[in-house]
A protein has these predicted regions:
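Compact, glycine-rich, soluble single-domain proteins
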Residues: 1-76
Length: 76
């Protein structure tokens, strides 16, 4: 596994989704939400304990668990 994950982004930073490294269930759920390769994603907020994080993609905010964010890899 190489590259930076969504969890590594700083607040307000944007990046492009490169690939998702997770089980079928996670991948299908994220794909259904429009979280696909080539989509720009921005880190909007981090919950007080670091979980979940709030991201914005395709114009809407989405809460993603920390463990899932670590499986979404980015091209920066």
């Amino acid at each position: 596994v190489d590259g930076m994950s969504l969890y590594d982004l700083n607040l307000g930073e944007k990046a492009i989704i490169k690939y998702i490294n997770g089980d079928d269930k996670l991948t299908k759920r994220l794909l259904a939400l429009g979280c696909i390769e080539g989509t720009e994603i921005e880190l909007k907020r981090i919950a007080p304990l670091g979980d979940p994080i709030i991201v914005n993609l395709r114009g809407f905010d989405l809460a993603i668990r920390k463990k899932d964010a670590k499986n979404i890899f980015l091209a920066v």
